[in-house]
């Protein structure tokens, strides 16, 4: 995956969730990219999650909501929504009845597009 990212985006850190969940971030684990295989639904979720303090998550929601036209120009299937425990996510799902090579390739491509598109906006948000 790193080879598909620009050099300045290759220095991410990773954490594992449960068996079919991976998170990666650039120094703030509460704001992370996530890939999660929802086995029961047969879907692969790819997105940017805001799982920090409720006020920070709300500010992130407001920031990205005002930029959804820009986001959807590169990520047309992306949805922004409040989520569990006061969290927020900007994500999409892909069909994934099984984690086969085709699904993994699509997940990597989608995740790379999310990072390339959203990380500059996330950096701008964090400076605001």
Label every model-predicted segment.
Residues 1-87:
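Polyanion-binding interface signature
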Residues 81-103:
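Short, intrinsically disordered low-complexity segments
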Residues 1-2, 63-75, 95-128:
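Ampiphathic alpha-helical segments that act as solvent-exposed interaction surfaces
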């Amino acid at each position: 995956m790193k080879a598909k990212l620009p050099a300045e985006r290759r220095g991410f850190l990773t954490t594992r969730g449960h068996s079919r969940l991976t998170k990666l971030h650039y120094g703030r684990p509460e704001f992370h990219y996530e890939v999660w295989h929802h086995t029961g639904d047969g879907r692969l979720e790819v997105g940017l999650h805001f799982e920090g303090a409720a006020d920070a998550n709300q500010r992130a929601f407001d920031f990205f909501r005002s930029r959804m036209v820009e986001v959807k120009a590169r990520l047309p299937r992306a949805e922004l929504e409040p989520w569990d425990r006061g969290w927020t996510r900007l994500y999409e799902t892909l069909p994934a009845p099984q984690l086969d090579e085709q699904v993994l390739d699509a997940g990597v491509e989608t995740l790379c597009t999310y990072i390339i598109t959203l990380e500059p906006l996330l950096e701008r948000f964090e400076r605001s």
